Structures are given as structure tokens and as C-alpha cells.
């Protein structure tokens, strides 16, 4: 059987010689194929054909050896043994594959943990570590290296706030202070553990430099670590104090700020109280108006007004004499103009003072008349009679009568005779009253008596309205 197969293999026709391509063994980027020359192809053609025939014969012989020689020696036990061997081989392959997959999963978990830790680190810390590694590779002769600042590798100060916010959003925010304190302690412990891991990793990244550093450098590193930790704690305390200052006990309370904060140029450092003008007549702080009490409290004011009036009169007299000495009122010298201007100011002040004095005198007379009416009503009530409340017109007549009595000297309460000044004032008042009444009589009496063109009598130009209505209104024609 083997011989037949061997003869058949020998009797096969030889394959045609094909063009041989050799790939560049250098593994260049271009992956180019090099074509051999014609002389090399002719010499190698026969050798390649013989080698192919020998390889085919060897393969056929191996296949024949593997197959059983006689079919009568093949039984069920041999088949079972073959299947058992195949199953064992498959089980071994599965075990090896499972072990490999477990190791692969563990390595993937470690890579994920490492990636998460690296993601939590700030970018500045990674850049600093990279700079340190570049420095170590560039300078090999340096024996002692300064340890990097681990404070830059710490987690962001607001990471805890972000975690708390995320927990509140997820509905896991702690309600009591004990839970908050325990969570904060746990987070601090985890943060401390993470810092230690980062520190150890930095030492490993430095390589053999840590072995050369002695105990003194290690102690200095520990001191630097403790100092950085103190600084972090101080920053946290300052942040907590700022938060406490920002809080207010009440929404209407003023905002508290730190005194260490510099004052801006736009804000007033010391706010002065602004002066507010207050009129005591319209303020409730001054109480109700009491004219008698006011007159008693400020009884010195009338004397001051009289002195001021006398001073103004004397000043006006002096200015008139000076103006006459400077060539009369038509003089145009600077001194004469200044005197004339000062005289005008004094005259205006004198008129104003005299008007205020007359107004005060009128109010005093009116208050005296009203006080007299009030005392009379009080006596009437004591006698059992009804009080008498006069009209405004009656009060006006009473004031006029009191004025003439006082000017004439007959109605003076002290019984003194009127002075020459009062007599002059009385004459002026009577003259004004006479002119006023005469003008009123001229307006009421018929004027312009003459003869009419057609009639026999004269018609007055104006006449009183006797038909009715308001008697005070004039009749219009």
C-alpha cells in the first residue's frame, strides 16, 4: 500500500518553474518586493523542483505511519482511549485559558484602580512629577535629590464639598452632626492614606535616588511633610472662619466682614453722621404747642429785637451823615457808592425788623383779646350761664377798638397817658380810616349828576342793587 502510494507520487508531473519573488527581510516601511535576475532564476529552478518532491514524499509517509496498518486490530477500547485523550487535552486547554483569563482580569482591575487614582490627582502634580523624572534622567551624577512638595499632590480642597453635594443629590445626605463628623473623619483618613501612597509612588519613580538619601534627608522630608500638613489645616480653619463670618443670625442683620480685608477707595472707612434739619413745630419730639410756656421760656427775645431795631436806626443815621459828607446822593466815587450800598442794606433790614415787630405786636394784642374772652366765658360758666363764642368779624371789631383805646391812652390797663409817638400813630391811623371811609362813600353815592338829552331828570352812573341778592356785590349795567 505504501509502495503504490510512493509510485504514484513519483509518477506525478513536475510543476512548471514560476518566477520567484523574494520579500525584503529587513522589514522596511515600504514593504517592497525584489525580483531576482534571470541568471539566478535559471540556476535555482532545478533545485526547487527536487526539494518540493522530497517534501511531498515525506508528508505522505508520515500520514501512512499514523494510520493503523490492519483494520482487524481496531476495537472500541482503542476508540474510547482516543476520545479520552482528546477530552483530557481539551480540559487542560480550558484550565489554562481560565487561569489566563483570571490573571488578565486581575491585571485589568489593577489598571482601572491605577487609572482612577491618576485621574484623582491634579494636573499640576502630574506635571511636577514628570519634571522631577526628567531632571533625574538628565542629571545622573546627582546623589541627593530634594523631595517634591507633596502639598501639590493633595486632593482639591473642594473635593469634600463636591462629594457632599453629590450625596445630597442622590438622597444620601446625613441629617445629624455625628454622621457628618464620622464621614469627614473617614474622608480625612482616606485622603491621608492616598497621600502616603502618592508619596511612596514618587519615591519609586525616582528610582535608586531614595537609597542614596540618608536618614537625615528622610527626617527633613518628614518635617516638610508635617509642615505642609499644618499649612493645609490652617487653610481649612481660615476657610471655616470665613464661612462663619458670612453667616448672619438674622436676614435683617448686617453682613459681618473681616477687619483684615483692605478697604476699597470707593467705600468710606468712617461714616460721619449727616446733619439733618429738624423743624420743632412739626416734630412730635418737641411735644404739643404751648404758647404761654414758649413766651415764658423765651422772654428775652423781645428785648433783643428792640435792641436790634435801635442799633439799625443808629446805623442808618450815621450812614446818612456819611453820604451827605461825600457830596450828596449823586456822588459817583467808590467810597460814596460803597456807603450808598451799605445804606440800602441797612434800610431793608430796618424795614424787615419793623414789620416783624408790628406783627409780633398784633399777635400779642390778638392773644390778649382772646384771653380776655376766655376769662369772661369762664366767669359765665361759673355763674351758670352759657359761654359766648364771638364771630371773626366781632373779634376784628374788638381788636380795632382795643387799638384805638391803646393809642388814645384811655384804654390802657396801666392807666398811663399816651406818649407823643402813640399820639402820632393814632393820628395816622385815624387819617387812613377817614380816607378809606370817604372812598367807600364816594363809591356808594350817585356821581356825575347832569341832564339827559330827552328826559327831564338826571340818572346816576352807579346805583345800589336793591332788587335783592348779595348786597356787597356791585351792580353791572
UniProtKB/Swiss-Prot annotation:
Compositional bias segments (type: Basic and acidic residues): 186-203, 226-247, 353-369, 414-424
Gene Ontology biological process terms, A to Z: maturation of SSU-rRNA from tricistronic rRNA transcript (SSU-rRNA, 5.8S rRNA, LSU-rRNA)
Family annotation (InterPro entries): RRP36
Composition-biased stretches (Low complexity): 206-219
Gene Ontology CC: one annotated term: 90S preribosome
Main location: nucleus
Ranges annotated as biased composition (Acidic residues): 47-66, 75-95, 103-112, 138-158
Keyword Electron transport listed: no
Sequence ranges of Basic residues compositional bias: 425-437
Alphabetic keyword roster: Coiled coil, Nucleus, Ribonucleoprotein, Ribosome biogenesis, rRNA processing
Annotated spans, Disordered: 1-286, 353-377, 403-477
Pfam families membership: RRP36
Coiled coil: 185-253, 333-361
Subcellular compartments: Nucleus, Nucleolus
Start-end of Polar residues biased regions: 1-10
Family: Belongs to the RRP36 family.
The protein's role, per its UniProt record: Component of the 90S pre-ribosome involved in the maturation of rRNAs. Required for early cleavages of the pre-RNAs in the 40S ribosomal subunit maturation pathway.
Summary of subunit composition and partner proteins: Associates with 90S and pre-40S pre-ribosomal particles.
PANTHER family assigned to the protein according to its UniProt record, in alphabetical order: RIBOSOMAL RNA PROCESSING PROTEIN 36 HOMOLOG (PTHR21738:SF0)
Protein known as: rRNA biogenesis protein RRP36
UniProt organism field: Mycosarcoma maydis (Corn smut fungus)
This protein's encoding gene: RRP36
